[in-house]
Structure formats: structure tokens, C-alpha cells
Regions:
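Alpha-helix-centered segments that form part of catalytic cores
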Residues: 96-125
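Generic protein-terminus/edge-of-domain signal
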Residues: 1-103
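Residue at a beta-strand N-cap/secondary-structure junction
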Residues: 49, 58, 216, 248, ...
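Generic structural signal for alpha-helix termini and adjacent loop/cap motifs
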Residues: 46, 80, 155-158, 181, ...
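Extended, amphipathic alpha-helical scaffolds
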Residues: 306-307
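An amphipathic alpha-helical interaction segment
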Residues: 113-123, 129-207
Length: 307
């Protein structure tokens, strides 16, 4: 698989909330903090404001606007930000639904399609390379998302057998497409493995690392895969990914290690050699540098969150 598919397969984003929200001319809605989630919204009709904690300026959303909110921060959607907001949790519990549409206030001056994705395990490998608000506003971007939006609207408004599963799968497709559009759009401005995928040379090297994480890769081998000299490759990788090739290899190995320990209960003695480490001590030291805790401490902390 390619690196983006690798990361998404590891995190297994699952759309646990997908729906359509409607509002009249005057409304305001407060959405709470949701750490470890990604929210995706597409404005089907009307305009509104988005104000997010930690972001200086509110964003104006218009018909056709699509956005990702990957950091789980609390935010307000509103026709007018001076209005007192309604709590989204209360709306979900008691709000009226008609033809699959949840109403914030009477009327349909505003319609937005939304999906909330839960990530399995630690999502920082993906979330840390994304800004608080990912805006997809230009016409070519909207066109590539249009079919998914229309299909999800159809499933929401006219529920059929199996419709919930279809909506969940289409929502996942929408998320992946939005990430692809973002990395292409922000190639010159973004730094991180996600943006590096838009550069064919860096993508080739990242694919080698993701394809064989246990291999004892050298800088020369990775540079050769990118068709570059060692010096130019090392400089280019650091500039686009934000870290050195060898540091990135370690980060990816430790991400895989954490996932395996959480999901399979494998021991360090079996995981370490499977990820290219000749000794448990070297593996444990690398793991602690990455996660700030020993492998055993990390697993205990993960289990405590599940209970």
C-alpha cells in the first residue's frame, strides 16, 4: 500500500456520526471537544460562520464549502456569532428529525452534511501534520467531492436497507478524498509526511520505508529510490517531511510497535526483531524517545483508557 493508505489502515477511521443538519435564518450551535476524532463538514445550502477555540479569526463557510476539523477542538457554527449557542449534545438527544435531517431551528435556510470519525489508537501520526481547520473551497476540489456528498444526502434523506453502512463507507471515501485534495493544495506550504506524498521522489522513499519498516535502510538506498544524490535527498526530505529519513523510519516503526502491543498483546521480544531491532534494549529506548514512556507503561496507559 501507499503511505497514506498505510496510516489510514492503521488508524481505521470509523464514521460514528453521519447526518444532515438544517437551520433557519438565525441560529448558533456549540460543538464540544472530541479528542482523537476528525470531523468532516460539507455545506449544502446557505452560509454560516465557524469560530474555533485557539484560532484567531472566524471562517466564513458558503454553499459548497468543505472542511476537515482534525484536532477535536470545541467550536461554534452560527449564522451570527453574537447569538447564544445551543449545545450540540442536547440537540442530538432531543432535537427533531424529519426525513433524516436534524433541525437546529425552524426552516432550511442552511443545510450541512457532517461526519465524525473516531480513530483507533493514537492518531497523532496523522493529526499532528494537519492544521486545526482544513478548508477545501475551490471549484475543482468541490467537484471531486460532489458525488460522495450527493450519495450521502440521498442515503440520509431516503433511508433504505443497508443505507447506514453505505453512508459510513461513502463518508470514509469523502475523508480520504479530502485529505488527498489538501495535500495537493498545500504542497508548497505544508510540512510533514502527508505533504511529502505530493512529491514523487519523496513518495518513493516513504513507500520504501512503509513497505519494509524492518529493513536496515541506509540513506544511500533511500536516496537511490528517489533518484537523487544522498545530499540532495537528505536536504529535500528534511525540508518536506520535517525530519531526517532515519528519524522518520524510527517514528514509523514505533507507531507500528505501539499498535501491535495494544491490539495483539505481543511481547517486546517478538516485536523488536520484526521491526528491525537486534536487541530489546535498543527497541525500548527508541520507543521511550518516541512516546515518552516505556513499552509496558504505554500499554498499561492504553488499557486504563479502555476501562
Amino acid at each position: 500500500m501507499d503511505p497514506l493508505s498505510d496510516v489510514l489502515s492503521l488508524l481505521k477511521p470509523r464514521a460514528y456520526v453521519t447526518g444532515v443538519l438544517a437551520a433557519g435564518p438565525r441560529w448558533s450551535l456549540q460543538l464540544p471537544v472530541h479528542e482523537g476524532t476528525i470531523k468532516c463538514y460539507c455545506v449544502v445550502k446557505g452560509d454560516c460562520w465557524l469560530s474555533m477555540e485557539g484560532v484567531d479569526e472566524p471562517a466564513r463557510l458558503r454553499t459548497g464549502s468543505c472542511l476537515l476539523l482534525p484536532h477535536g477542538r470545541p467550536f461554534v457554527l452560527a449564522s451570527d456569532l453574537t447569538l447564544p449557542p445551543r449545545d450540540a449534545r442536547e440537540l442530538l438527544a432531543t432535537g427533531e428529525r424529519h426525513n433524516g435531517v436534524l433541525s437546529v431551528s425552524p426552516g432550511e435556510d442552511f443545510l450541512v452534511l457532517g461526519s465524525h470519525f473516531a480513530l483507533e489508537g493514537d492518531g497523532r501520526f496523522l493529526l499532528d501534520v494537519l492544521p486545526p481547520i482544513v478548508m477545501l473551497n475551490n471549484e475543482s476540489q468541490r467537484e471531486s467531492l460532489r458525488w460522495a456528498i450527493e450519495r450521502m444526502l440521498r442515503e440520509m434523506r431516503d433511508p433504505q436497507p443497508g443505507g447506514a453502512l453505505i453512508a459510513q463507507q461513502v463518508a470514509y471515501t469523502l475523508l480520504v478524498e479530502a485529505l488527498r485534495l489538501h495535500l495537493a493544495d498545500d504542497l508548497q506550504r505544508g510540512t510533514g509526511w502527508l505533504f511529502a506524498l505530493a512529491d514523487s521522489r519523496m513518495r518513493a522513499a516513504l513507500s520504501c520505508i512503509h513497505g519494509e519498516p524492518a529493513r536496515a535502510w541506509t540513506l544511500q538506498e533511500l536516496a537511490r529510490s528517489a533518484g537523487m544524490s544522498r545530499t540532495a535527498f537528505a536536504r529535500g526530505f528534511k525540508r518536506t517531511v520535517g525530519t531526517s529519513p532515519m528519524d522518520y523510519l524510527t517514528q514509523w516503526r514505533m507507531t507500528l510497535a505501539a499498535k501491535r502491543m495494544q491490539n495483539t498483546g505481543e511481547t517486546i521480544s517478538s516485536i523488536a526483531p520484526a521491526l528491525g531491532y537486534k536487541s530489546e534494549s535498543a527497541f525500548s529506548a527508541a520507543f521511550k524517545r518516541q512516546w515518552g514512556a516505556s513499552p509496558r507503561e504505554h500499554v498499561r496507559a492504553h488499557r486504563s483508557l479502555l476501562h
